[in-house]
């Protein structure tokens, strides 16, 4: 199993698909990386040489922010919004939808399971 950016990549899958197992690399970026390095798209991970794995690793380290760094930056951006006290930060702090969705009904994923309220029986 090849290890790229701290993630064990599945060996039986095509390289483009396997790279999407890394947080921060989706299908588009995976295709770009494979084209930059010059690996055929049909090649499977177990068919890669050590030199090709090293090239992929270097291309990712050089051009993309992935895994821990990306998670840390995302968390810092959310923390910054919360510290500013702006509307988006308040929504994050309260655990409500941030992007304008309705909350009267729905939004259960963000708000958590429904809470019973005393005196609401019919």
From Swiss-Prot:
GO molecular function: rRNA binding; structural constituent of ribosome; tRNA binding
Keywords: Ribonucleoprotein, Ribosomal protein, RNA-binding, rRNA-binding, tRNA-binding
Superkingdom to which the source organism belongs: Bacteria
Pfam family, one: Ribosomal_S13
GO biological process: translation
Any single GO CC term annotated in Swiss-Prot or TrEMBL for this entry: cytosol
Record flagged with keyword rRNA-binding: yes
SUPFAM superfamilies reported for this sequence: S13-like H2TH domain (SSF46946)
Segments of this protein annotated with the region Disordered: 99-122
InterPro entries assigned to the protein according to its UniProt record, in alphabetical order: Rbsml_uS13_C, Ribosomal_uS13, Ribosomal_uS13-like_H2TH, Ribosomal_uS13_bac-type, Ribosomal_uS13_CS
Binding partners and assembly: Part of the 30S ribosomal subunit. Forms a loose heterodimer with protein S19. Forms two bridges to the 50S subunit in the 70S ribosome.
Function: Located at the top of the head of the 30S subunit, it contacts several helices of the 16S rRNA. In the 70S ribosome it contacts the 23S rRNA (bridge B1a) and protein L5 of the 50S subunit (bridge B1b), connecting the 2 subunits; these bridges are implicated in subunit movement. Contacts the tRNAs in the A and P-sites.
Family assignment from sequence similarity: Belongs to the universal ribosomal protein uS13 family.
Protein name: Small ribosomal subunit protein uS13
Native organism: Rhizobium etli (strain CIAT 652)
Organismal lineage: Bacteria, Pseudomonadati, Pseudomonadota, Alphaproteobacteria, Hyphomicrobiales
């Amino acid at each position: 199993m090849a290890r790229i950016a701290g993630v064990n990549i599945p060996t039986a899958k095509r390289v483009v698909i396997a790279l999407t197992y890394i947080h921060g690399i989706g299908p588009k970026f995976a295709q770009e990386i494979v084209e930059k390095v010059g690996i055929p798209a049909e090649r499977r991970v177990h068919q890669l040489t050590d030199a090709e794995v090293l090239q992929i690793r270097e291309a990712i380290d050089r051009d993309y922010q992935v895994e821990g760094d990306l998670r840390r930056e995302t968390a810092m951006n959310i923390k910054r919004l919360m510290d500013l006290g702006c509307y988006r930060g308040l929504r994050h702090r309260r655990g409500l939808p941030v992007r304008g969705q309705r909350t009267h009904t729905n939004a259960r994923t963000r708000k958590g399971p429904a809470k019973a309220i005393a005196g609401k029986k019919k």
